[in-house]
């Protein structure tokens, strides 16, 4: 039998096949091979009934996320709050870099707009991201049609309202929500397991919140490719390996000078590039000591 893992909990993998969910375990040979089944995996399995079955093999994955452990994702809704916590373009760009690198379509959703006195600043931010090519949503009405026939992950900084949004989209889920800690400005983690839910003709996953995000991009070329506007401009740079920092005849820097590139995004790119270089130097020092 073939199906997709829709839930993982306490060593059991719940596999959906033809609308029926089977409780399964992974064969011991998976551990020997260092393979771990994840939510989203397409698998071959055997089962005598719905409560006892075994996963026999895992199909090749098209993409994966480490945090949360989920695979074969079509798109990700990155939820950023307008306030409490304040909107953070740097954190948003970290999510976007990860998703671009993983070839997962991002959707930006802004929550808590009612806490703003006006939308002027957020509207300006929205225009910048839309000009890059990102889908940017303010409401459930804008978001819901995008969920059909897709596997969608919901992600974002803790306290931005992921579970609250999902409860509005699908009240039957009754997901626990948490308030912001006044002293830290951080939300409490309220999601304990990764599961798929059938919502609006698609599958969605609510995932553990993040207070920070580590992305897997570890070189300048991949970082450049993960910024769509830089990726497009880099074809016109004089040097193929241009890092858009000091090189002459750099199309990115020229676009920045002409006001055709958003300074905020470029500054975040430079920060991420600096972090990559710092990690590389640290790694070299560790290797040298060995």
Curated annotation (Swiss-Prot):
Its EC number is 3.6.1.-. Zn(2+) binds at residues 237, 242, 244, 250. One of its GO terms (cellular component) is cytoplasm. GTP binds at residues 111-114, 156-164. It is found in: Cytoplasm. The keyword Kinase does not apply. It is an enzyme of class 3 (hydrolase). GO terms for biological process: ribosomal small subunit biogenesis. PANTHER family: SMALL RIBOSOMAL SUBUNIT BIOGENESIS GTPASE RSGA, SMALL RIBOSOMAL SUBUNIT BIOGENESIS GTPASE RSGA 1, MITOCHONDRIAL-RELATED. Belongs to the TRAFAC class YlqF/YawG GTPase family. RsgA subfamily. Monomer. Associates with 30S ribosomal subunit, binds 16S rRNA. This is Small ribosomal subunit biogenesis GTPase RsgA.
């Amino acid at each position: 039998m073939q199906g997709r893992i829709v839930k993982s909990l306490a060593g059991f993998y719940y596999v959906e096949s033809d609308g029926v969910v089977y409780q399964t375990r992974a064969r011991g040979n998976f551990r020997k091979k260092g393979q771990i089944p994840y939510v989203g995996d397409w698998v071959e399995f055997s089962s005598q009934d719905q409560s006892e079955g075994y996963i026999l093999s895992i199909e090749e994955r098209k993409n994966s996320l480490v945090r949360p452990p989920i695979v074969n994702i079509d798109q990700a809704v990155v939820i950023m709050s307008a306030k409490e916590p304040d909107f953070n373009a740097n954190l948003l760009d970290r999510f976007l870099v990860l998703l671009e690198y993983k070839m997962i379509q991002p959707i930006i959703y802004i929550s808590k707009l009612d806490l703003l006195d006006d939308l002027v600043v957020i509207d300006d931010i929205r225009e910048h991201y839309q000009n890059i090519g990102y889908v940017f949503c303010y409401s459930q009405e804008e978001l819901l049609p995008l969920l059909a026939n897709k596997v969608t992950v919901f992600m974002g900084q803790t306290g931005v309202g992921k579970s609250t949004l999902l409860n509005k989209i699908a009240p039957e889920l009754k997901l626990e929500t948490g308030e912001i800690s006044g002293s830290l400005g951080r939300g409490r983690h309220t999601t304990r397991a990764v599961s798929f839910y059938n919502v609006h003709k698609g599958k969605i996953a609510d995932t553990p919140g993040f207070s920070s995000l580590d992305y897997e991009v570890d070189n300048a070329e991949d970082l450049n490719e993960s910024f769509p506007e830089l990726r497009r401009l880099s074809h016109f740079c004089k040097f193929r390996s241009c890092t858009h920092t000091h090189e002459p005849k750099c199309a990115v820097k020229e676009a920045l000078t002409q006001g055709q590139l958003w300074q905020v995004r470029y500054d975040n790119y430079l920060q991420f590039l600096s972090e990559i270089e710092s990690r590389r130097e640290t790694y070299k020092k560790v290797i040298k000591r060995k």
